């Protein structure tokens, strides 16, 4: 009888614990100081939420018909992604849909960006194996940015899959990024100061 009560308690508490964990993770991000938000601070918070390296987070701003990297800084000068291209970030911006790829090496993408040395990581056998991509929307529903979280490793099994829950979390984070961009003077302006 005592075991039944524990089981019922677990069934009731389990979704509540999962919700509390999700809220803590989102609060980590929402706790950023809005006036001081920069692409670097936002992407560092996102990396922390998803337990990835900061160089595994990308933030691109839509400017006209091009997506330009705001973060990582090393990719700012590497070029832009045309909105009309088949790149994942471009598709995310066009469709306004979040996507998850646990087989990213099989997806057609702009691998040129993977050749740019990021931070002190150097060029090694670490390639993007897994990727999530989500649109960042303005209050009017227009795409203003795209945020991506990846996992790099020498082979797919070493990277660990993203889950549908991770993608939901990224969509929530993208909403917060949109609010940061709307409430502040904009992330791009903060990064150029």
Annotate the PLM regions.
Residues 11, 28-32, 40-49, 91, ...:
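Amphipathic alpha-helical regulatory segments at dimerization interfaces
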Residues 2-10, 143, 151-173, 180-189:
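Regulatory loop-to-helix N-cap segments in sensory/regulatory domains
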Residues 1-37, 176, 183-193:
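Signal-transmission linkers at sensory-effector interfaces
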């Amino acid at each position: 009888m005592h075991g039944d009560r524990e089981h019922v308690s677990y069934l009731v508490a389990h979704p509540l614990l999962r919700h509390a964990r999700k809220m803590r993770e989102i609060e980590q991000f929402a706790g950023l100081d809005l006036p001081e938000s920069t692409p670097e601070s936002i992407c560092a918070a996102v990396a922390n939420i998803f337990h990835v390296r900061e160089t595994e987070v990308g933030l691109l701003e839509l400017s006209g018909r091009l997506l330009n990297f705001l973060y990582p800084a090393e990719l700012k000068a590497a070029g832009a992604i045309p909105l009309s291209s088949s790149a994942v970030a471009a598709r995310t911006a066009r469709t306004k849909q979040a996507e998850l790829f646990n087989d990213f090496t099989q997806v057609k993408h702009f691998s040129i960006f993977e050749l740019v040395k990021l931070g002190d990581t150097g060029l090694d056998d670490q390639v993007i194996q897994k990727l999530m991509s989500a649109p960042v929307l303005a209050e009017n529903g227009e795409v203003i940015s795209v945020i991506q979280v990846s996992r790099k490793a020498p082979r797919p099994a070493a990277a660990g899959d993203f889950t549908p829950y991770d993608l939901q979390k990224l969509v929530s984070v993208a909403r917060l990024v949109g609010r940061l961009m709307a409430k502040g003077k904009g992330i791009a302006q903060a990064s150029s100061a």
